[in-house]
Amino acid sequence: MAFLTKKKKFKFQTSFNLEELTAVPFVNGVLFCKVRLLDGGDFVSQSSREEVQENCVRWKKKFNFVCKMSANSATGVLDPCVCRVSVRKELKGGKTYSKLGFADLNLAEFAGSGSAARCCLLEGYDTRNTRQDNSILKVNIGMSLLSGDPCFKTPLSTVKTVSPPGQDSSLQMTCKGEGTVRSAGGTVRQNRSRQAMLSSGVFDETEQNLSSPEETPHSGHSRNSSQASQQSKISGHSSEHSRCSSMSDLTHRRNTSTSSSVSGGLSLTAEGTEPERDVKPEKPPRPIRPPLHPDRHSRRKKDSVESQPTWVDDTRIDADDIVEKIMQSQDFSDVSNNEDSHLRLFVSRDGSTTLSGIQLANRISAGVFEPVMIEIR
């Protein structure tokens, strides 16, 4: 039975891409990383030294190395193979450095998955005396099998999913859209895919329309606003209820199409939906459009789309109307050919000259200026 305790050996060609470090708590500085295999090899390498720009450092450095792994022969699960990425900052012009933090990555989780990206928070070396930063390191890891049994299992992922505050912990990635879940006590609970929409009040109206189990005449009836109308699998479902549900969908356009599914041979009659119709608020009336200009349609194209009045055309000022108003406000009937209305040249006795029209000529006293006539030859 010694062969059962012997572990399987594997070799993987690893492509480790060091992408970037975001949310760096420094405005300037030079950072670099040291990549080292803690298990399955002796690979050690450093990245290039890059400056901090807009609280972000981008290395775009690729490391290629071979790592060795082992797996239990009974279960086939790969043993951990940790690769540590240490982020460091240059000090004294590059002579020394300080360690900002590190991130440990289990390469066994990436075995056989092709290329996968991972973002992880930096862990501090001295968490007692230094404050931990929220810098996020992004890497891209790809692994391919070189030797060993191709049948193996990867360990469970250590990635932790953090849900926003106030979000229901029962919501998982498999829950899609909206739905109603019946608990053991018989109460109906509605799932929401996004808790943020509830806080903003988007679904306030739909929550009011959902009736509680005490208000509904039959406890086996539940409504789902995200699905289409379903046909009952029970032979006792009447056609009158289907006509009633379709009429309620047409009259209330703000709500999505509803459906009803009956369990246990119970059916919902038309009288049960009447109180729900009274609770729903009516759609507010649309504001009245301003009257159109009588000459507006003559200037438009006669296409089928542009011939219909739109809100943009009603609120837009027509340039032709402004030109017509300006032309009508001007008086072009008084056309005078009198020479006194033009500019006149006056020369005084001391040789000074002045230009003026008829208004200044009337105010000038006689003898001070003499008019000069210039003839065209």
UniProtKB/Swiss-Prot annotation:
Main location: nucleus
Coiled-coil positions: none
InterPro entries: EEIG1/2-like, NT-C2
Polar residues composition bias: residue spans: 160-173, 188-198, 222-234
Keywords: Cytoplasm, Nucleus
Cell compartments where the protein resides: Nucleus; Cytoplasm
GO cellular component, one term: membrane raft
Biased composition (Low complexity): 256-269
Region spans: Disordered: 160-313
Pfam families: NT-C2
Compositionally biased region (Basic and acidic residues): 274-285
Domain C2 NT-type: 2-145
Domain of life: Eukaryota
Family the entry assigns: Belongs to the EEIG family.
Role description: May be involved in osteoclast differentiation.
Protein name listed in UniProt: Early estrogen-induced gene 1 protein
Organism field: Xenopus laevis
Lineage: Eukaryota, Metazoa, Chordata, Craniata, Vertebrata
